[in-house]
């Protein structure tokens, strides 16, 4: 089993993958996207899926604080639908990722004393790691299916 985690933003998608045992998540890279021009980095995702032999996708779902689905969560679901269309054999699941990017930024400031410029370069990848690690720790459905 190897899961791939996604932090889908409006300009970038952070990517993380799990180890083969589903215990830990590691950051892979940040893919630049352009929603206005329908460029979603799916060619690069395809390469990463083959490289890492991915068996499941986990996308962060940025719900509103009142648990409703806002525009960014809809965009994450649309990205998940594109993944399903491109990889029909690979299941997609979602996990609530409220405040994950805020947590990631706080971690970079407080623990790594990282400059603003450096934070912008790694924040989405770290958020993807946190999304996937939270999913692994919660033993989400894809961890139990033998994917």
Swiss-Prot record:
It comes from the Bacteria. The keyword Hydrolase applies. Gene3D superfamilies: YqgF/RNase H-like domain. GO terms for cellular component: cytosol. Its EC number is 3.1.-.-. Keywords: Cytoplasm, Hydrolase, Nuclease, Ribosome biogenesis. Its main location: cytoplasm. Belongs to the YqgF nuclease family. This is Putative pre-16S rRNA nuclease. The lineage of its organism: Bacteria, Bacillati, Bacillota, Bacilli, Lactobacillales.
